[in-house]
């Protein structure tokens, strides 16, 4: 059996490719079923965020398993395999384990140390368990990866003051507005007419960061206006006007800065809509939706500047030098956790031998117990029989304790193989070749 991961991220694919591979929560169940239908895939879990799609699997054969996962990704995205393959990465065994732990710790994120990825890994684990697509191996790996992410954030300063996708989007707006005014620093958003489209988790974070950067009023649009109203109630000190998405064009015309973060699988704003709006001043779009909420063609409009998640790198790079130093400390913690998992996984090699040894000794125990009880005669009470049976079970457990502990203890593969051979030979757990 092999642990593998196949996927793509902001490091390997631009947003126009990633948006075709975004798997919404409502499609996860169907996707997991499709992956489990491959005969080589034993366990599988999907991580889908705005910056990555990664499929972790336990497979019988690593080559055919990886090919099956790639086939699924190509079919799901509708991208021809030869066009898709250059954007995909594949990690196997130790590298796959290390990659997931680094992802969970925020070490592979666009924003080093960002915290949202940890909750996304938790969700991946929950969805895998709910859909029964994960088993003992991936469940152990996911659980330990989540613990690793928590450990890195609690024992290092990597997560301290870390920006998120949402905060980076707000900083990008500050940077671009400042550059237009001839400044190289981040300016206040107090004078901007701000529109936020979408009322989900990312929009909540957007509003939180907008507030901290000087914004004191904004318009909030959502398809479900009740959800927008509920979100607005969490910001009583901000002036938030909530409206339906059907009023989008009208409110764009009143805005100078528009943030979009909806779950729409198609753009909600394109050049045709923009051309219908009488823009009296320049307009900036910051789109953090994946798939993108804003069509790329809006950039053709002379009064519009549009940015997506790939443009956040400009802001992120301003903060990375300090975080890179802290990341070294975090990587050493991740490596420790990787070794712990691999030692546990290697110890599973001993399970069949341990089970056979326990089974053989249990058979002997029952046979000898039955002989002894038959000699005791009818005067031997049921209570006394239970005491004797408990005694024999205790003896077996005591006998097994030391060899089982030794077989499961951390050791090299070569050492474990030698130990297993010795136990098998001493207890006749395998049939010897009669021809020898």
Swiss-Prot record:
Species per Swiss-Prot/TrEMBL record = Prochlorococcus marinus (strain MIT 9301)
So, what pathway does this thing act in? Porphyrin-containing compound metabolism; protoporphyrin-IX biosynthesis; 5-aminolevulinate from L-glutamyl-tRNA(Glu): step 1/2; Porphyrin-containing compound metabolism; chlorophyll biosynthesis
Give the protein's recorded name.
Answer: Glutamyl-tRNA reductase
- Record note on domains: Possesses an unusual extended V-shaped dimeric structure with each monomer consisting of three distinct domains arranged along a curved 'spinal' alpha-helix. The N-terminal catalytic domain specifically recognizes the glutamate moiety of the substrate. The second domain is the NADPH-binding domain, and the third C-terminal domain is responsible for dimerization.
Keywords in alphabetical order, please: Chlorophyll biosynthesis, NADP, Oxidoreductase, Porphyrin biosynthesis
The entry marks the following residues as binding substrate, namely 49-52, 109, 114-116, 120
Q: Which GO terms describe its molecular function?
A: glutamyl-tRNA reductase activity; NADP binding
Enumerate the HAMAP family for this protein: Glu_tRNA_reductase
Query: Which PROSITE patterns does this chain map to?
Result: GLUTR (PS00747)
Q: What does this protein do?
A: Catalyzes the NADPH-dependent reduction of glutamyl-tRNA(Glu) to glutamate 1-semialdehyde (GSA).
InterPro entries, A to Z: 4pyrrol_synth_GluRdtase (IPR000343), 4pyrrol_synth_GluRdtase_dimer (IPR015896), 4pyrrol_synth_GluRdtase_N (IPR015895), GluRdtase_CS (IPR018214), GluRdtase_dimer_dom_sf (IPR036453), GluRdtase_N_sf (IPR036343), NAD(P)-bd_dom_sf (IPR036291), Shikm_DH/Glu-tRNA_Rdtase (IPR006151)
Give the record's subunit note: Homodimer.
Source species, domain of life: Bacteria
Q: What other note does the entry give for this protein? A: During catalysis, the active site Cys acts as a nucleophile attacking the alpha-carbonyl group of tRNA-bound glutamate with the formation of a thioester intermediate between enzyme and glutamate, and the concomitant release of tRNA(Glu). The thioester intermediate is finally reduced by direct hydride transfer from NADPH, to form the product GSA.
**Residues with site note (Important for activity):** 99
